[in-house]
A protein has these predicted regions:
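Short His-Asn-centered micro-motif
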Residues: 1, 138-142
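Glycine-rich phosphate-binding P-loop
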Residues: 1-19
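Short, well-ordered loop/turn elements at secondary-structure boundaries
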Residues: 3-4, 130-135, 154-158
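Short alpha-helical
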Residues: 4, 146, 169
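Generic, well-ordered alpha-helical scaffold segments in large soluble proteins
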Residues: 12, 122-129, 151-157
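A generic secondary-structure signal for well-formed alpha-helical elements
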Residues: 16-23, 130
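PAPS-dependent sulfation machinery
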Residues: 26-137
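Conserved phosphate-donor/acceptor-positioning beta-strand/loop module used by diverse small-molecule
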Residues: 140-141, 150-172
């Protein structure tokens, strides 16, 4: 995919106090591990998951290397795109994406209705855990493009922003 500035736009829109994106650390450990529903227990659990997930994230960063970070910076506690939580059964997870690039028509054979339903539950879990944060979710993933009908069916009230650069202007 050509670089269209979606990461920069995502970061910019994420500065607005009424929007919220999920963070990389929340993608690793979205579900509380305690049965205690009190606010203090939930906060303690959230902080513990945050702290315990950092070494795994940093290991992934070392494996990905500086080149990937220059293309798409990922921070542990900053807005992140929805590639990871949607990749449970979507065709763009790391193990299948390289094969799909070779035969991109297969991308259109998938139905992501169930994936988006699971993603909606993921967002509900995060909203429940941090009700004091902004409630307007901002989603970002370039792989949504072939599945806009299913995305809209799951999130019917969500506006879509499409960034575009003409290929002749961005590819030498």
């Amino acid at each position: 995919l050509t670089r269209t500035g979606t990461t920069y736009l995502h970061e910019l829109l994420g500065l607005h106090p009424e929007t919220r994106s999920h963070y990389a650390w929340e993608q690793q450990h979205p579900v509380p591990t305690t049965d205690d529903e009190s606010a203090s227990a939930q906060q303690f659990d959230r902080e513990r998951r945050y702290k315990e997930g950092r070494p795994r994230f940093e290991k992934g960063q070392r494996i990905a290397g500086d080149y990937f970070q220059r293309i798409h910076k990922i921070c542990y506690d900053a807005s992140e795109e929805c590639t990871v939580p949607c990749s449970v059964e979507a065709p763009w997870n790391a193990s299948t994406l390289t094969f799909m690039v070779c035969s991109s028509e297969k991308l259109f054979d998938y139905s992501l209705g169930q994936t988006y339903q699971l993603y909606s539950r993921f967002l509900q879990i995060l909203t429940w855990q941090a009700p004091d944060l902004a409630s307007t979710w901002m989603l970002k993933c370039p792989f949504h493009l072939p599945y806009l009908i299913e995305l809209h069916a799951t999130f019917p009230d969500s506006p879509l922003i499409w960034t575009h650069r003409h290929p002749c202007e961005c590819i030498p």
